[in-house]
């Protein structure tokens, strides 16, 4: 009913709002207030809140997907596009697109979102879905990527718990053991 297909919660269309259906009423911004109350209650009980975030792709899919947000604003800055055929999206995520964290505009959006969740919503850390896609340079994944360097230098985010899902679908994307020292990693093979 929202024009979204294959939507299971990991196909974001906005990075600053809890999903409305997670709130008791699901309307009028209740989800934000309820999330804040939830975090306060967990903290009062001595439980930290780690937010699972998806900054590697959006619900807009590939070049045939719907225009829901970034595609309609500034496609070439928000998405990684194929160099030889920029109508097509680079897809390290298996969803049809990959956000372009090499773009200062996109990186700023992600950092603003992280700071919002940390300062306004008071979460204690983040688990980054397909974190290798976030740490890619032009072709490979690197500890010295712009994204990881920006996280390391941020006075708020660098002090939180940071957990990488250390892989993506691109060549060399499996990066277990290769994220910087301050990061914890999920080991999918260990399960």
What are these regions (language model features)?
Residues 1-122, 130-153:
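Substrate-binding/active-site clefts of carbohydrate-active enzymes
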Residues 50, 127, 163:
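Generic enzyme active-site microenvironment
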Residues 10, 130-191:
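Active-site-proximal helices and loops of the catalytic beta/alpha 8
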């Amino acid at each position: 009913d929202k024009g979204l297909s294959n939507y299971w919660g990991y196909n974001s269309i906005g990075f600053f709002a809890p999903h409305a259906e997670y709130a008791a009423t699901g309307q009028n911004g209740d989800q934000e207030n309820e999330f804040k109350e939830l975090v306060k209650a967990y903290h009062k009980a001595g439980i930290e809140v780690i937010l699972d975030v998806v900054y590697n792709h959006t619900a807009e899919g590939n070049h045939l997907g719907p225009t829901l947000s970034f595609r309609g604003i500034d496609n070439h800055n928000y998405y990684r596009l194929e160099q030889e055929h920029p109508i097509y999206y680079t897809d390290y995520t298996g969803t049809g697109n990959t956000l372009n964290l090499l773009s200062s505009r996109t990186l700023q959006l992600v950092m603003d979102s992280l700071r919002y969740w940390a300062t306004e919503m008071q979460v204690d850390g983040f688990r980054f879905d397909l974190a290798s896609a976030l740490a890619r340079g032009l072709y490979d994944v690197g500890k010295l990527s712009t994204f990881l360097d920006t996280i390391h230098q941020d006075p708020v985010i660098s002090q939180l718990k940071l957990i990488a899902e250390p892989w993506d679908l691109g060549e060399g994307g499996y990066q277990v053991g290769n994220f910087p020292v301050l990061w914890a990693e999920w080991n999918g093979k260990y399960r």
